[in-house]
Amino acid sequence: MPAIYYVPGRGGRLNSGLGLELSARGYDLIGREIAGPGPRDQSNPFASLSFQQQVEVIQHDLQTHFWTPEALVIGNSFGAYLIAHSILQLGNFPGKCLFLSPVLGAVKTTGMLFKPPKSGVLKDAIENRSFPLIILDILAGSTDEHLLPVEAEQLSDQTNGSLSIIEGQGHQIEPLIIKAKLDAWLD
C-alpha cells in the first residue's frame, strides 16, 4: 500500500487520531511526532531537536522517501508549519500536500501572543509570493484562533490546490469533516 508522510501537531501521535484513520484506509505512515511535555523532551529525540534541526530532518525524510509526484504529505497544526518551512527552504516539492488547521505564523490568542520560530520568514515568503509552487490543499476552521485567514488565502492563491475554511469549526475540526476531506484528497 502507498505511504503517507504525516507530521501531527504538538502532542499528536502517528498511531492515534488522524494517524489511525489513515492506517485504517490502508496507508503506511511515515512521519515525525512533536510529542512530549516540552521542546527538550528526551523521550522523543525529534522533539528534543531545535526548530531548524527538525526542519532539516523533515527535508531529509521528504527527499529520501517522498520525492516523487505521487508523494502524499499531511501536516496538522504545528506539523504543517514545520513542513511549510521545510518546503520553503528546499525551494520545491514534487508531491501533494494537505495542511489541516495549519499554524502559519504569529497570532494573538486569548490574551497571549503565540509566535512560532521563524514566523517572519514564512510570512515574508507568503506576502512576497516566493513560497514554492506546490500542490497544497488547506482545511481550517473559521473559529480557529490559530488561523491567519489572510495568510492562508495568500498561500492558497500561490499554490496549486484549494483552501476550505469550515464555518463554526475551531482548531480541532470534527472527524467527519476531516474524513470527507480525505475522501476527496486521496481520490
Q: Predicted segment positions?
A:
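Conserved hydrolase catalytic core segment
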Residues: 85-96, 105
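Serine-hydrolase catalytic machinery in alpha/beta-hydrolase-like enzymes
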Residues: 2-71, 81-85, 127
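Active-site loop->helix "elbow" adjoining a glycine-rich segment at hydrolase catalytic centers
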Residues: 76-80
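Short beta-strand/loop motif that positions the catalytic acidic residue
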Residues: 132, 137-140, 152
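Catalytic histidine-centered segment of alpha/beta-hydrolase-like enzymes
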Residues: 169-179
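Active-site nucleophile loop of the alpha/beta-hydrolase fold
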Residues: 34, 98-107
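Conserved alpha/beta-hydrolase "acid-adjacent" motif
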Residues: 145-151, 174
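Conserved alpha/beta-hydrolase fold motif
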Residues: 73-74, 97
